[in-house]
Amino acid sequence: MLEAAELECERGARTLFRAVSFVLAPGELLRVAGANGSGKTSLLRILCGLARPSAGEVRWKAEPIARLKEDYSRELVYIGHAPAVKDDLTPRENLAISCILAGQAASAEALAEALERLRVPELPVRKLSQGQRRRAALARLLVSEAPLWLLDEPFATLDAQGISLLNDLLEKQVDGGGAVVYTTHQEAGIRSTRVVDLGAGA
């Protein structure tokens, strides 16, 4: 499904990580571990195609993602560490725009149902708490049928209820044959299939 082959990432004169390799199969949940500065976010950006590795290659279904481009983008959901939601829009408007940009269509009913399930109030995002903003971003997972999820610190700012909801989503994704790569600084109850440890960092 997803293959990382001898990935290396450099920032200036510093090497964040090197020789990172794994093959992620359907139904697997992979946690990326490592201290701050070890390159966890950089690895996820490389895996989703937003950044290029200094060396190595990412493959999706045996094809280099550089060749697949938009076709690969439609097969994944990437949610970064900072919730990518616009303050002046409502959660539903943000969700609709993110689906359009990703080329992943969703009905108005599906958008409303996703936000209701995650208990996100329909207010301008600037009025939401950090945890509610995170839930608004995570609603993408409910309206997408993408087989691959790449999640950077998805549990950050969530309360106990939010963590439980996200755990349920992750379990449903892998039980349905999807795959997940995520980073986290906290034990959140979900048990990963495997761990890639990037080490101590800077």
Where do the model's predicted regions map?
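Conserved ABC transporter NBD signature motif
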Residues: 53-72
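Conserved ABC ATPase "signature" region
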Residues: 96, 106-123, 139
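Catalytic Walker B motif of ABC-type/P-loop ATPase nucleotide-binding domains
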Residues: 149-153
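Q-loop/switch helix immediately C-terminal to the Walker
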Residues: 82, 87-102
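Hydrophobic anchor residue at the start of the ABC signature
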Residues: 138, 177
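Helix-to-loop junction immediately C-terminal to a conserved catalytic motif
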Residues: 48
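The feature captures the beta-strand-to-loop junction immediately N-terminal to the Walker
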Residues: 33-35
